[in-house]
Amino acid sequence: VTGCVNNSNMTSAGNSKSGIAGENYGTVRKSENNGDLSNSGNVGGITIENRNGKGQALLFIDDYADLSVNGEISECVNNGAISGKYDVGGIVAENYSCGKIENCANTAEVSGSMTGGIAGRASGCYKKSGIKNCQNSGNITAQGSYGGGIVGELINGLVYFCENTGDVNVENCNS
């Protein structure tokens, strides 16, 4: 997926919501979300899940998705307010299984339980995945226990050359 733009506000009571792609096992590049997204589950400005999908089936697709095995998001921007109940990120709700996020930015407010300016939750394999050269300037509010300017919860992943200038407010103590 390259050069896609979402300008629509979306609110639903379903499980997950994103501006560009549901689950990404491919590449999303130079895409932008400008719409406010709100949902009772996981929410990501660009995708819900980003992962390396070697041999896995694509389970569900939002508006635009590409099936391959890369799991890469690059040069994407979120400008819309993002709110959800669980994993919530300005770019992606969950970054798993060697997924890469590079050169992306979030400028909007993000709120949820496990909440980050770029990713709500990130885990993967060392040296093969991570979040690189990303910026967050939006304010982060974690109603649960994990919140961060870049990632809400990081397990076995890498974050490098990233910058947060937004405020981070966490209601519980795991920040």
Q: What is each model feature region?
A:
Residues 1-175:
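Predominantly extracellular beta-rich ligand-binding scaffolds that present long acidic/polar faces
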